[in-house]
Amino acid sequence: MQLTVELSRFRVKEGKTAKVDEWMAFLNNHMKDTLLTLENEKMYVETIFREILDGREYLYWYSVQAEGGIEIEDSESYIDKKHIEYWEECIDPSYGMVDLTPQVVMIPKPVYETMEELDKQYDETFKKRGWTKSPMSLS
């Protein structure tokens, strides 16, 4: 199983602090459904950090993800659709993103083995059924 471990920085558009507050509250207030979307993306860990640096606001995404999950843009989940709306309103596209380079990735063997088992289960249920959309959208 191939894992991607990322830490990426994005700049928030000027004047969007209150909207970012709303965005983070939305994700926290809908955590059960938010976690379901992560399963479909094979996203095992996702954490959002926030920082003010030299008077500018930034959001950082830390993630641990296996290959082969659905892309957020392909999701039918209301969580993902709303997340994309907030993203487009709040994230400054002129800044791009800054990916920090991992130097050491430390995942204890029992945790890695659990992720491998989840990866196998995902492939057996989602991929082998020939689904092209998130299972959440099929219910």
Language-model-detected regions and their locations in the chain:
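Short, well-ordered beta-strand segments in beta-rich or mixed alpha/beta enzyme
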Residues: 6-11, 20, 46-78
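An amphipathic, aromatic/His-enriched active-site/gating alpha helix that lines ligand/cofactor pockets
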Residues: 33-44, 65-112, 123-139
